[in-house]
């Protein structure tokens, strides 16, 4: 039995939309309902610490074993747990009461590839929606961190994650420089405007011009995102058909968690409409029903506890962890 704590993004006993991996991992544990599956997660405690300092790569979720070993990320954690019970089998029940399946040996390579495809390609698209879609970032993402983190981390963290997302998404929507950043553009524009004229009318007109340019740029980025998402979903569906569709795989959870986050953001209705146009409402409704089942499934397998002082992302521990990196 694996014994340790799983640290996640979340609050009030629920994983946050800010982290696809945290959501998928909670669903993974909740779906371990057979005796064999329960033994895989029975020794785990769920901690919504929101503290990336606990992870060696600065990301959550992270599994910290009692012996000090750390495993970060949904893919790595799931694979680690599977390896500890590699001879176990999970059988399908009824009415979505499936346990997670360890697929047959000949299908394991495809399952592994599918899992990593979702982790790399589709999760990157979710990062775009969280941090680079202006509507989502300003109306939801940026505000959410003030509820999850201590001051002043709630201000710096979203900026850092946005910068990372900008680098990761260059292949999708092209190079995003500082000039594409809303706050940077606005500050530079107003600085230039004040130098040319001090009239209030001129400043307002210039600001509206910059805003219009940004909106057109966002439309272009969204179109590029839509095309990439539709391509990724098509690839995922084609590969998934080659595996047993009567069981829920760990890759299914990560895929649906990505969909759950993207559709749950302020711009989610637009994404849903695009997906329905391409894949039909029946498929989207089927996926939504599965998501609802995962979200509302009883949490009997989740042993939760509050983060201890040393596990919190408060100012004291943040400074301590920072100092430890240079010792």
From Swiss-Prot:
Entry keyword set: Membrane, Mitochondrion, Mitochondrion outer membrane, Protein transport, Transmembrane, Transmembrane helix, Transport
GO cellular component: cytoplasm; mitochondrial outer membrane; mitochondrion; SAM complex
Coiled coil: none
Compartments it resides in: Mitochondrion outer membrane
TM regions (residue ranges): 17-33, 247-265
InterPro entries, alphabetized: Mito_Protein_Transport_Metaxin (IPR050931), Sam37/metaxin_N (IPR019564), Tom37_C (IPR031317)
BP terms from Gene Ontology: mitochondrial outer membrane translocase complex assembly; mitochondrion organization; phospholipid transport; protein import into mitochondrial matrix; protein insertion into mitochondrial outer membrane
Membrane topology: Multi-pass membrane protein
Pfam families, per database record: Tom37, Tom37_C
Leftover remarks: Present with 1580 molecules/cell in log phase SD medium.
PANTHER family for this protein: FAILED AXON CONNECTIONS-RELATED, METAXIN RELATED
Subunit structure: Component of the mitochondrial outer membrane sorting assembly machinery (SAM or TOB) complex, which at least consists of SAM35, SAM37 and SAM50. SAM37 interacts with TOM70.
Protein role: Component of the mitochondrial outer membrane sorting assembly machinery (SAM or TOB) complex, which is required for the sorting of proteins with complicated topology, such as beta-barrel proteins, to the mitochondrial outer membrane after import by the TOM complex.
Name of the molecule in the record: Sorting assembly machinery 37 kDa subunit
Recorded name of the encoding gene: SAM37
């Amino acid at each position: 039995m694996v014994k340790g704590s799983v640290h996640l993004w979340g609050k009030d006993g629920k994983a946050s939309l800010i982290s696809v991996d945290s959501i998928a991992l909670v669903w993974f544990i909740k779906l371990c309902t057979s005796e064999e599956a329960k033994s895989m997660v029975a020794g785990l405690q769920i901690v919504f610490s929101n503290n990336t300092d606990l992870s060696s790569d600065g990301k959550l979720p992270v599994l910290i074993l009692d012996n000090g070993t750390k495993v970060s990320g949904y893919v790595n954690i799931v694979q680690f747990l599977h390896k500890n019970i590699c001879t176990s089998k999970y059988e399908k029940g009824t009415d979505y009461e499936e346990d997670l399946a360890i697929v047959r040996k000949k299908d394991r390579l495809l399952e592994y590839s599918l899992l990593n495809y979702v982790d790399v390609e589709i999760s990157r698209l979710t990062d775009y929606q969280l941090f680079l879609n202006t509507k989502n970032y300003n109306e939801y993402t940026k505000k959410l961190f003030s509820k999850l983190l201590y001051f002043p981390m709630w201000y710096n963290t979203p900026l850092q994650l946005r910068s990372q997302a900008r680098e990761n998404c260059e292949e999708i929507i092209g190079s995003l420089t500082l000039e594409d950043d809303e706050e940077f553009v606005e500050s530079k524009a107003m600085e230039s405007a004040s130098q040319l004229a001090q009239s209030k009318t001129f400043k307002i007109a210039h600001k509206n011009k910059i805003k219009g340019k940004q909106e057109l740029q966002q439309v272009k980025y969204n179109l590029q995102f839509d095309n990439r998402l539709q391509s990724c979903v098509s690839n995922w569906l084609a590969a998934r058909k080659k595996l047993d569709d009567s069981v829920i795989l760990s890759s299914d959870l990560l895929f649906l968690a990505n969909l759950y986050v993207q559709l749950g953001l302020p711009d989610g209705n637009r994404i849903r409409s695009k997906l329905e146009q391409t894949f039909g409402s029946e498929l989207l409704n089927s996926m939504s029903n599965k998501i609802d089942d995962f979200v509302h499934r009883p949490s009997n397998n989740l042993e939760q506890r509050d983060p201890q002082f040393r596990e919190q992302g408060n100012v004291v521990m943040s400074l301590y962890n920072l100092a430890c990196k240079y010792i």
